[in-house]
Curated annotation (Swiss-Prot):
Subcellular location, record wording: Host endoplasmic reticulum membrane
Transmembrane spans: 3-23
Family according to the record: Belongs to the Tymovirales TGBp3 protein family.
CC terms in the record's Gene Ontology section: host cell endoplasmic reticulum membrane; membrane
Keywords, ordered alphabetically: Host endoplasmic reticulum, Host membrane, Membrane, Transmembrane, Transmembrane helix, Transport, Viral movement protein
Other observations noted: TGBp1, TGBp2 and TGBp3 seem to act together for cell-to-cell propagation. TGBp1 is the main movement protein that physically cross the plasmodesma with the viral genome. TGBp2 and TGBp3 would facilitate TGBp1 function.
Protein name: Movement protein TGBp3
Lineage: Viruses, Riboviria, Orthornavirae, Kitrinoviricota, Alsuviricetes
Cited function: Plays a role in viral cell-to-cell propagation, by facilitating genome transport to neighboring plant cells through plasmosdesmata. May induce the formation of granular vesicles derived from the Endoplasmic reticulum, which align on actin filaments.
Keyword Ribonucleoprotein appears in the UniProt entry: no
Length: 66
């Protein structure tokens, strides 16, 4: 992966985390440590249904394969 690919993926994840944090701030604890994101204390089961199904590259985000 080159730098551009990492930036695109990073921005995508950041937007998703911020968006989700605004929806579930009272329900979830989101801790970011280095490259790993840990979401805990969620009362909303939809979170665990959505996360495994997320495919960043299916939403019009095209990253050339290296």
């Amino acid at each position: 992966m080159d730098f551009t690919t990492l930036v695109i993926i990073g921005v995508y994840l950041l937007v998703f985390i911020v968006y989700f944090a605004k929806i579930n701030t009272s329900m979830c604890t989101i801790s970011i440590s280095g490259a790993s994101v840990e979401i805990s204390g969620c009362d909303n089961p939809a979170l665990f249904e959505i996360l495994p199904n997320l495919k960043p590259f299916d939403h019009g985000l095209s990253v050339p394969s290296i």
